[in-house]
Amino acid sequence: MTIDRTYPIFTVRWLAIHGLAVPTVFSLGSISAMQFIQR
């Protein structure tokens, strides 16, 4: 089946995007929060 062949690639790509996006958004949120607290 073609689904079994494309499924792992799609999953790895999804994990890679979220693995990079989640820490980036979290770090941006923490940096902005620290700046708000300092002011």
Swiss-Prot record:
InterPro entries, alphabetized: PSII_cyt_b559_bsu, PSII_cyt_b559_CS, PSII_cyt_b559_N
GO molecular function, a single term: electron transfer activity
TM region(s), chain numbering: 14-30
Protein's membrane topology: Single-pass membrane protein
Localization in the cell: Plastid, Chloroplast thylakoid membrane
Principal cellular location given in the protein's record: plastid
Listed SUPFAM superfamilies: Cytochrome b559 subunits
GO biological process: photosynthetic electron transport chain
Keywords: Chloroplast, Electron transport, Heme, Iron, Membrane, Metal-binding, Photosynthesis, Photosystem II, Plastid, Thylakoid, Transmembrane, Transmembrane helix, Transport
Names of the cofactor(s): heme b
Comment on bound cofactor: With its partner (PsbE) binds heme. PSII binds additional chlorophylls, carotenoids and specific lipids.
Record's keyword annotation contains Hydrolase: no
Quaternary organization: Heterodimer of an alpha subunit and a beta subunit. PSII is composed of 1 copy each of membrane proteins PsbA, PsbB, PsbC, PsbD, PsbE, PsbF, PsbH, PsbI, PsbJ, PsbK, PsbL, PsbM, PsbT, PsbX, PsbY, PsbZ, Psb30/Ycf12, at least 3 peripheral proteins of the oxygen-evolving complex and a large number of cofactors. It forms dimeric complexes.
Its job: This b-type cytochrome is tightly associated with the reaction center of photosystem II (PSII). PSII is a light-driven water:plastoquinone oxidoreductase that uses light energy to abstract electrons from H(2)O, generating O(2) and a proton gradient subsequently used for ATP formation. It consists of a core antenna complex that captures photons, and an electron transfer chain that converts photonic excitation into a charge separation.
Family from the record: Belongs to the PsbE/PsbF family.
Name assigned to this protein: Cytochrome b559 subunit beta
Native source organism of the sequence: Huperzia lucidula
